[in-house]
Amino acid sequence: ASEGKTTVAVNLSLALAQNGYSVLLVDADLRKPSVLKNLGISNLSGNGIADVVNGAKNSSDAIKYIEKYKMFVLAGDESITDPTEMLSNAKTGEFIAAAKEKFDYIIIDTPPIGIVADAAICAKYTDSSIFVIREDVFPVPAILEAVSDLTQGGTDLAGCVYNISTDRSKGGYG
């Protein structure tokens, strides 16, 4: 939907890392992973969340420290045949729980909520969620339903990012 969710996830991760926090950015959008592309990284294939969950790699091998950005990244992998099933796997929850012990912040980039169940599934592993909304894409009832889906999973909604707005008459900076 090009709402900018990956850009928000990457920039939040970068801001936290630049402020000295230990950050893990997880690309859980297994249908269209784009975190690495957004960071300008092309050499981490075979080091994704699916490799950890299916036991092909342990997390310390799959999670890569990106010196340039001072943060850790766990790549996505679009070759997974059933991303929803993989993200629902108990091992995914175990991995996130273990990662919470090692990192100050874990930022999880997911597919857009409402299109597939993946975002709502990942929300149950989080302490809070940020909902990225692109102007004029979804009607208000669909947005409210998506917020309900997120919070029913047990996550707190930290806030919303109203993104890619074209209306400059409402104020702002610049």
What are these regions (language model features)?
Residues A1-G174:
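P-loop NTP-binding module
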